[in-house]
Amino acid sequence: TGSVSVLWGAPPRHEDRDGDGIVNTLDVLVGAKKLCENKAAYVSNYRALGYPNGDVPRSEGVCTDTLVRALRNAGWDLQSGIHEDAIRKPRLYPLEKAPDANIDHRRIRMMLPYFRQHFVEVKKDAPYLPGDMVLLDTFPNKAGADHAGIVSDRLGPSGLPLIVNNWTDGYVEGEMDLLPTIPVLYRFRVPMTPRPAP
């Protein structure tokens, strides 16, 4: 990262949330690529987590952990962000009971209201950029997003960007050519400029 700062100058603080000299969008992508190297197995279960920055064991995860971990690499803690926001603004969240810091940040239905407030929603016809976060619909007969991933910097056989994700049982974290067949319902990007408080 030192050479990047020397060549380009350090990015403004609002474009480098964690102060590591890497702009936010690239930092999210780097976090996602690290996950591909780690190859966490798809394991869906409820666990008691530390707080803040709690995580399941690195050897396992679900699709939402892709976003949690990639964003953490750029300085965002979705666990505390979503938990504290849901406590402050419960009407914005589809809570079934009191907010739960062990699981809420790992649920797409809880990510969506948080992302709408804190990240940039990208229009469907805008070009995909590496580091974009996508919420997808893998079950067309069941309304709503049920899968999540990060847009890669590599193209698949379709010519479209691959998606870093943890697909389902029997899979490990990796890049897949999902865009030709799995509808993207929502796309978000980490902010490159400061956003006003909601």
Regions found by a protein language model. Give the residues of each.
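...with weaker cross-activation on analogous glycine-rich loops/strands in unrelated enzymes
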Residues: 22, 87-169
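N-terminal capping segments
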Residues: 4-114
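A structural signal for short, hydrophobic beta-strand segments that form beta-sheets
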Residues: 78-79, 151, 182-184
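Low-complexity, Gly/Ser/Thr/Pro-rich intrinsically disordered linker/tail segments
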Residues: 158-198
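Low-complexity, Gly/Pro
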Residues: 1-4, 198
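Short linear sequence elements within intrinsically disordered, low-complexity coil regions
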Residues: 51, 119-120, 193
